[in-house]
Regions:
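Polytopic transmembrane helical bundles with strong interfacial aromatic enrichment
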Residues: 1-150
Length: 150
């Protein structure tokens, strides 16, 4: 995203210039090797990357909701509500930063917001891994301090 400056082409949200899926992506003639090799020569790959990035974001939000609702009782029981709270907070910040980068990318990319968006993504991933670890750990042991039980 950042190397392609894709936000400059579609600085709108939630739609990409009024379309959920840009028409250029649906144009089968645009799906050729040249558009993938010389990606900066036309709008096709920029639109595709922007669409895929947004779609992954939407899927991550759905997955995060699943994590929140699935793990909450386990986390509460294990005293991990702080990690869950941080995960939810960082996810909301991540969404806000991503939308802000798009909406403020008119003529120039807001580099600081973009870098923060990337940094918070690392935090969200780290917290998701921690939550997954404790969820998996819960299925192996009944208590966080009782490491002898299988």
């Amino acid at each position: 995203m950042s190397g392609m400056k894709a936000a400059l082409v579609y600085p709108t949200w939630p739609l990409m210039h009024g379309e959920f899926i840009p028409a250029i992506i649906l144009d089968l003639s645009a799906w050729n090797v040249d558009n993938f090799v010389d990606y900066d020569q036309g709008p096709f790959l920029i639109a595709l990357v922007q669409f895929v990035h947004r779609s992954i974001g939407y899927l991550l939000v759905i997955n995060a909701l699943y994590i929140i609702f699935s793990f909450y009782s386990i986390m509460k029981e294990r005293g991990m509500t702080l990690v869950m709270g941080l995960f939810i907070t960082m996810l909301i910040i991540q969404i806000g930063l991503g939308i802000s980068v798009l909406l403020k990318s008119i003529g120039t990319i807001p580099v600081l917001i973009g870098v923060l968006h990337q940094a918070v993504a690392i935090l969200v991933l780290t917290l998701a891994v921690i939550l997954y670890y404790f969820h998996s750990f819960n299925s192996l042991v009944s208590s966080p301090l009782n490491l002898d039980k299988p």
